[in-house]
Amino acid sequence: MITKDSIETAYAFLHQKLRVYEHSTLDWQKDDIEMIIGDYADQINPELLSMLSNGRPDYLKDHKKFQDDITHAVAVLENIL
């Protein structure tokens, strides 16, 4: 079951990290954010992650798609709130 609390928590965390990621000029900082979000994706409500990812197993974990994934996740969560 996807709770309002899990949506709000995911949105707050991902939104904050996205803003830092977008404005960062430091590769190591971006890499750290990708690693943190990848770890978070392993702990997020499984139903919420499935809804966001459309079942894609590498969602929020693929370096090449990371910025698109996190931007998508924040937009979807924002629309739900």
Describe every region a protein language model picked out.
Residues M1-W28, V74:
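Short terminal alpha-helical segments
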Residues T3-L14, I33, I37-L49:
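Short amphipathic alpha-helical heptad-repeat segments
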Residues E8, D27-D39, H63-T71:
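Short, charged, amphipathic alpha-helical segments
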Residues S53-L81:
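Charged low-complexity stretches with an acidic bias
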